[in-house]
């Protein structure tokens, strides 16, 4: 069975401001890429963290059956949230340890639901450090943001 990897990234011009997300999905056999799919989208008024979350959500929601995959993100916010903080948030009724509402709770809950159908390994890598898959996800995120920087609207995947 091939390895499934998703590189995800978000981008924002201003924070908040126009933003985009990108995901590069790859089925691989060792170093050989068997299949590749590019996803992207954006919003007119958003934050970088929301775009990072939407990139991961979109990668998971694009899968048409339960899968085992690795999601590679340059967002410590997403990686730490899904692998650590979320357990406490759920236990506390989606409140932080200081009893404040979790920011972006709508997307965290959607990510939790999307992940529940799959077996996911989460990896963090340094952004803008020459990782080919991450650089491509960044390009997709910027392309997803582009229509919103000029006032146009669009999404494809």
UniProtKB/Swiss-Prot annotation:
It is found in: Cytoplasm. Its main location: cytoplasm. It comes from the Bacteria. It catalyses: Endonucleolytic cleavage to 5'-phosphomonoester. Mg(2+) 1 binds at residues 9, 52, 74. It holds the Pfam family RNase_H. GO terms for cellular component: cytoplasm. Gene3D superfamilies: Ribonuclease H-like superfamily/Ribonuclease H (3.30.420.10). Mg(2+) 2 binds at residues 9, 138. It is an enzyme of class 3 (hydrolase). One of its GO terms (biological process) is DNA replication, removal of RNA primer. SUPFAM superfamilies: Ribonuclease H-like. GO terms for molecular function: magnesium ion binding; nucleic acid binding; RNA-DNA hybrid ribonuclease activity. InterPro entries: RNase_H (IPR050092), RNaseH-like_sf (IPR012337), RNaseH_domain (IPR002156), RNaseH_sf (IPR036397), RNaseHI (IPR022892). Residues 1-146 form the RNase H type-1 domain. Monomer. HAMAP family: RNase_H. Endonuclease that specifically degrades the RNA of RNA-DNA hybrids. This is Ribonuclease H. The gene is rnhA.
């Amino acid at each position: 069975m091939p390895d499934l990897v998703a590189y995800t990234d978000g981008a924002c011009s201003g924070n908040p401001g126009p933003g985009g997300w990108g995901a590069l999905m790859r089925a691989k056999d060792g170093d050989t890429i068997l299949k590749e799919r590019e996803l992207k989208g954006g919003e007119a008024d958003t934050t970088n963290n929301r775009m990072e979350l939407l990139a991961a959500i979109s990668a998971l929601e694009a899968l048409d059956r339960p899968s085992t995959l690795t999601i590679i993100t340059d967002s410590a916010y997403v990686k730490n949230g899904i692998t650590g903080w979320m357990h406490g948030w759920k236990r506390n009724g989606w409140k932080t340890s200081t009893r404040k509402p979790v920011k972006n709770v709508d997307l965290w809950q959607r990510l939790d639901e999307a992940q529940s159908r799959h077996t996911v390994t989460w990896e963090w890598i340094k952004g803008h450090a020459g990782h080919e898959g991450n650089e491509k996800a960044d390009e997709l995120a910027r392309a997803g943001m582009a229509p919103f920087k000029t006032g146009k609207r669009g999404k494809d995947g």
